[in-house]
Amino acid sequence: MRIEQDLKLGFKDVLIRPKRSTLKSRSQVDLNRQFTFKHSGKTWSGVPIIAANMDSVASFKMAISLAKHNVMTAVHKHYSVEQWGEFVSSQTADVLKHVMVSSGTSDADFIKLSEILAMSEELNFICIDIANGYSEHLVDYVRKVRQAHPQAVISAGNVVTGDMVEELIIAGADIVKVGIGPGSVCTTRVKTGVGYPQLSAIIECADAAHGLGGQIIGDGGCSCAGDVAKAFGGGADFVMLGGMLAGHEQSGGEVIEQDGKMMVKFYGMSSQSAMDKHSGGVAKYRAAEGKTVLLPFRGSVDNTINDIMGGVRSTCTYVGAASLKELTKRTTFIRVQEQENNVYGKE
């Protein structure tokens, strides 16, 4: 047993210090990034925000809507090959280039992934996702997928420390997904005592990834546009959002009427609800590590994504960053004990 004395920080522990700016308007800020990925050699440009691979968030409808904003969707892994076929055949390259194909790590997942990728040359992104990215099994699976699909852009996770980021990149991942337990419907930290404050995880993992020519996705913990900006400021190349994009007409969650109001079911992918739906219940040897909540129906996701991007543009103007790429260079975090004045309630 050992104790690390360094304080680790989450988004609520800091604010970004304003700096002089020559920008006259938020409209001058460019949120598009261009990346050339280490192993695949592929180049992608767009707004590096990703809808999380949850079946009550990342539906095909979500992918179609977010592609209009140059935003990515990690489409959840529970669609059948037939459903993927219908989607791919009905969409343009402009949509498909903003889609990530999600996969588990079983032999069946590998076969299904290969069948889906074969449907279109525009499907370039793979999201390999397991809750515990510290498993050697994940590293072996990344090697297997890289060997079978050398042209694909592979993201893998989830992890929270630089050593594992480096191992996954060396094994063949272009991008590493960072975050254990910060999500709004995740209870891993409560059930297991395991986790890492998300901002510190992003800062440390970005440093490790960038040293090897890789990228990271900050996955989880964002509850407002300011948190998204802090994630980018901390060095995240991409930011993945679940709860912030849940509850919309494109999210795919079950719609329920409660007391005359439209509500949408949203749940973690290790929750009782998810395991009842996809695995026939919670196995006897494990515990559910997610919540199920009802969110007020929020209409179209277009308004929400515009609000998020508007907030990040505003962050850039406050620190003098003309582009999202410059934001991390212009970011100085200050530790705080307060975030906002809630005398009239929260935003």
UniProtKB/Swiss-Prot annotation:
Enzyme nomenclature, EC number: 1.7.1.7
Taxonomic placement: Bacteria, Pseudomonadati, Pseudomonadota, Gammaproteobacteria, Alteromonadales
Binding site for K(+): G181, G183
Record flagged with keyword Isomerase: no
Reactions catalysed according to its record: IMP + NH4(+) + NADP(+) = GMP + NADPH + 2 H(+)
Keywords in alphabetical order: Metal-binding, NADP, Oxidoreductase, Potassium
GO biological process: purine nucleotide metabolic process
Pfam families linked: IMPDH
Any one cellular-component term (Gene Ontology): cytosol
Leading EC class: oxidoreductase
Binding-site positions, NADP(+): 108-131, 216-239
Protein name per UniProt: GMP reductase
Residues annotated as catalytic: C186 (thioimidate intermediate)
Domain of life: Bacteria
